[in-house]
Amino acid sequence: MKELHKTSFLESLLIQKRVIGALLMREIITRYGRNNIGFLWLFVEPLLLTLVMVLMWKFFRMHNVSALNIVAFTLTGYPMMMMWRNASNHAIGSISANTSLLYHRNVRVLDTIFARMLLEIAGATIAQVVIMFALVIIGWIDVPADIFYMLLAWLLMAMFAVGLGLVICSVAFHFEPFGKVWSTISFVMMPLSGVFFFVHNLPQQLQHYVLMIPMVHGTEMFRAGYFGDSVTTYENPWYILLCNLVLLLLGLAVVARFSKGVEPQ
């Protein structure tokens, strides 16, 4: 009897890469279709939402309230919030939408979750880059002070989005009503994520508690990279990284546990 070929770690990674790539294409076609602009909605949708927020703050003349560029302030907070919120929201339905695919030997529950979250992260990232580049060109905002620091903050928050998505998906799998209310909960969390404020402007007795929220550190770090020394920020990259690792390890462990009861044997 011919012995089955055992794949190496590198071969397994290549297989998983192809599987996730195929799931990504399936998700894009299923969600956006093949007609009209199709997959371009991947980043057009978050771009338009961000643009609406920017224009609203711009034309309501919120720049008269502060000397800070209010367009840049909005742009350095809202898209990042959309990334972790959308990634966690869409992670919830990833298993039910791809149940039939789990009968394929190389498709795992984790792959379906990763594919959806990567799609949301990619869309938010492209939207952030495109709209920031466009607004710099037309002179609405200045060139960022430290692009590398902004990139590091974005990567840390993308990592946070993945960890949060895994945990939320796991909780929703075990407690279905939670999946229905998470969208509302995440919406309520928007004001707490640092999108609409600098920690420095809060009362000192509140700052300690606000800095316990990992999303606040990501937003502060991203804005520190953009505005440079013109603003005072209180980010701690190591704290975000620690929170990310905890979420990732917890999420991976729980997903691995319930996957055994979902994937066909």
From Swiss-Prot:
<feature type="transmembrane region" description="Helical">
    <location>
        <begin position="147"/>
        <end position="167"/>
    </location>
</feature>
<feature type="transmembrane region" description="Helical">
    <location>
        <begin position="37"/>
        <end position="57"/>
    </location>
</feature>
<dbReference type="GO" id="GO:0140359">
    <property type="term" value="F:ABC-type transporter activity"/>
</dbReference>
<keyword id="KW-0812">Transmembrane</keyword>
<dbReference type="GO" id="GO:0015920">
    <property type="term" value="P:lipopolysaccharide transport"/>
</dbReference>
<comment type="function">
    <text>May form an ATP-driven capsule polysaccharide export apparatus, in association with the CtrB and CtrD proteins.</text>
</comment>
<keyword id="KW-0997">Cell inner membrane</keyword>
<feature type="transmembrane region" description="Helical">
    <location>
        <begin position="121"/>
        <end position="141"/>
    </location>
</feature>
<keyword id="KW-1133">Transmembrane helix</keyword>
<keyword id="KW-0625">Polysaccharide transport</keyword>
<dbReference type="InterPro" id="IPR013525">
    <property type="entry name" value="ABC2_TM"/>
</dbReference>
<dbReference type="Pfam" id="PF01061">
    <property type="entry name" value="ABC2_membrane"/>
</dbReference>
<dbReference type="GO" id="GO:0043190">
    <property type="term" value="C:ATP-binding cassette (ABC) transporter complex"/>
</dbReference>
<dbReference type="InterPro" id="IPR047817">
    <property type="entry name" value="ABC2_TM_bact-type"/>
</dbReference>
<comment type="similarity">
    <text>Belongs to the ABC-2 integral membrane protein family.</text>
</comment>
<keyword id="KW-0472">Membrane</keyword>
<protein>
    <recommendedName>
        <fullName>Capsule polysaccharide export inner-membrane protein CtrC</fullName>
    </recommendedName>
</protein>
<feature type="domain" description="ABC transmembrane type-2">
    <location>
        <begin position="37"/>
        <end position="258"/>
    </location>
</feature>
<feature type="transmembrane region" description="Helical">
    <location>
        <begin position="64"/>
        <end position="84"/>
    </location>
</feature>
<dbReference type="InterPro" id="IPR000412">
    <property type="entry name" value="ABC_2_transport"/>
</dbReference>
<keyword id="KW-1003">Cell membrane</keyword>
<keyword id="KW-0972">Capsule biogenesis/degradation</keyword>
<feature type="transmembrane region" description="Helical">
    <location>
        <begin position="236"/>
        <end position="256"/>
    </location>
</feature>
<keyword id="KW-0813">Transport</keyword>
<feature type="transmembrane region" description="Helical">
    <location>
        <begin position="178"/>
        <end position="198"/>
    </location>
</feature>
<keyword id="KW-0762">Sugar transport</keyword>
<dbReference type="GO" id="GO:0015774">
    <property type="term" value="P:polysaccharide transport"/>
</dbReference>
